Amino acid sequence: MTDNKQTVLLAKRVWYFSENDEAAFFEWLDKLPCVEKYEGRSDELEIYVNAAAADAGSVYELLALFRRYEIDMRQLRVFDREEFASWFRNRRAYWFKDIFEAET
């Protein structure tokens, strides 16, 4: 779900291997300046991202976070923008298939 600047990314059924792993997940989110807030609902976490505030570093971190915690990476297509195109659409990048070739 998106509007002009805010995007809601969904983390469904995230599996943590320990309490510290769970804490690390939320600390990681807290370090990202483009993440405005997050809210849990049942087994889903809604992550509110200010897409306009997302820079390359933030997008790289979201890619790593989503990969590490096995969150559906297809929703990161919202960052497929001209300013990131030179590296975001790199077919050899570890995220490419999960974002652009994954079944919907």
Feature-to-residue mapping (PLM):
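Short, ordered beta-strand-loop transition motifs
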Residues: M1-D3, E39-D43
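Conserved strand-to-helix beginnings and helix N-cap segments that scaffold or border functional pockets
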Residues: E19-A23, A56-V59
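Histidine-anchored nucleotide/phosphate-binding helix
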Residues: F25-E27
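Short, surface-exposed ligand-recognition loops at beta-strand->loop->(often short) alpha-helix junctions
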Residues: A11-D21
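Short acidic amphipathic segments
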Residues: L29-E39
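Short, hydrophobic beta-strand segments
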Residues: N4-A11
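Helix-rich interaction surfaces within compact, conserved domain-sized segments
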Residues: A51-T104
